[in-house]
Amino acid sequence: MNGLEEVKEVVIIGDGAKWVWNIAEELFPDAVFILDYYHFSEHVHECAEVIYPEDEVNRRRWIDSIIEGFMNGRIEETLSVIDPDAYEDEKASKKVAELKNYLESNKDKVRYKEYRDRGYFI
């Protein structure tokens, strides 16, 4: 007996690496999976640095709008404004596409409003 049968709920926080989720899902199929806020935020900040390398005001505004959207449960709406085609600069467009892919592939793990409402650490 390892004590897991007494646990009401298992919550796993990870960085978004597919191998982490694969192992976690295999071992704990009924767990709640959360993309940790640090890595979520890090990806958003890195993307904003490429979009607005010289414009701190718009960079901060963009970061805040993306993070606020996810934190307030507006996941689909926020994902829709992360649009690679909105950027003429190839490097910016590529970075936005990478961010969108990262967030879409972890969409079921970024329900931060729900997690905070349930008292989970993110």
Describe the predicted segments one by one.
Residues 1-122:
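Catalytic center-proximal scaffold of phosphoryl-transfer enzymes
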